[in-house]
């Protein structure tokens, strides 16, 4: 046998083997594929039961014309996809809740800052009147003390003098009132007294004879008749 014929025979055998393997793979792939009816029935079973017992797997495989291994693999893949979908849903819900809470936190943080600033402003406004009142009270007390000291130092002596003068005047008035009450007459006016004095001087200067005839008893009698009981006052 020639060398070229040998290589041709080997190549033909290899190619035939490859074609046989391809056919087997196609058959296996056809066996693995599921029809739409099989998939729908498997989906309905999965909604009620996510895991099947061995007896249940055999029963489902017979009903659908599949092998029990195919049913087990399909349920296994379906559970994995279902878990990933559930995790995605939970993650999306948690992410939405987190974003909502984060936005609320930012809003509350801003409100807190505004409230803190407002509280500081109110505290400052409350402290200002207290300080002003304190200064006003201190100023009023200082003025009152200074005015009281000045009035005490400047007006004590004149007031004392005035009080002494008023006491003396009151004593004089009291004595005059006593005299008028006991003697029974009031003081005459200055004009009347001057007239009496002038008449007395004229009478004394013109008539010297009257000096000799001056009777002291008559004067005493007249004064006693006009002003009775005047000695009782001095007794």
From Swiss-Prot:
GO MF annotations, alphabetized: DNA-binding transcription factor activity; DNA-binding transcription factor activity, RNA polymerase II-specific; transcription cis-regulatory region binding
Region (Disordered): 128-167
Family assignment from sequence similarity: Belongs to the HD-ZIP homeobox family. Class I subfamily.
InterPro entries for this protein: HD, HDZip_class_I_plant, Homeobox_CS, Homeodomain-like_sf, HTH_motif, Leu_zip_homeo
Iron in keyword set: no
Subunit structure: Interacts with TFIIB1.
Expression triggers: By water deficit, by abscisic acid (ABA), by cold and salt stress.
UniProt subcellular location: Nucleus
Alphabetical UniProt keywords: Activator, Developmental protein, DNA-binding, Homeobox, Nucleus, Stress response, Transcription, Transcription regulation
Task performed by this protein: Probable transcription activator that may act as growth regulators in response to water deficit.
UniProt GO BP: positive regulation of DNA-templated transcription; response to abscisic acid; response to osmotic stress; response to virus; response to water deprivation
Lineage: Eukaryota, Viridiplantae, Streptophyta, Embryophyta, Tracheophyta
Ranges of compositional bias, category Basic and acidic residues: 128-138, 152-162
Highest taxon in the source lineage: Eukaryota
Protein name as catalogued: Homeobox-leucine zipper protein ATHB-12
Record Pfam families: HALZ (PF02183), Homeodomain (PF00046)
Entry GO CC: nucleus
DNA-binding region: 27-86
Summary of the tissues where the protein is detected: Widely expressed.
Stretches the record annotates as Leucine-zipper: 87-122
